[in-house]
Amino acid sequence: MHKCHISTFDQVDLHYRLDPQTEHTKQVLRRDSATVVALERLYRKGGELHAYAFTFMSMQTVERLSLDLDNKERMLDFLEDKAYADANHGNIEIKYTHTVNLADRKDKLMGQNECFLLLETIFDKAEPDYPLMYNKFYIPQQFSNIKLNITKG
């Protein structure tokens, strides 16, 4: 998020819930998991919501990594830094959307009618066949700065 957004944030709220597996989560996480973890990150500046991220992780991954979902500081560190340091590879699909579905309907994303949507799958070295996490990043167009670095593999 921080590399694609021109603002700095003074607050990041993290919420999670446990959801039953759906066909969508089975597809994006590439495994059967009776329960998946859905995590929301709300990036704020001056109280206004400037960006939003939604993450799915399988319960198997959470348990294997011994992640404490109730420790918000450590979870944020994992989601924002450690997962990328431990990643084997990943892919990103860039889309444009006019719809942002926030869990809390009272929240409104700045510029929500025009957002870049980055769909990111991160794979881990320990289990390279299964995604570590699947992210959806919503970045309002007016705050976006998306650059791609291409290297020869």
Q: What does each model-identified segment do?
A:
Residues 7-153:
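C-terminal all-alpha effector/ligand-binding and dimerization domain
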Residues 1-6:
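Short linear motifs at protein or domain termini
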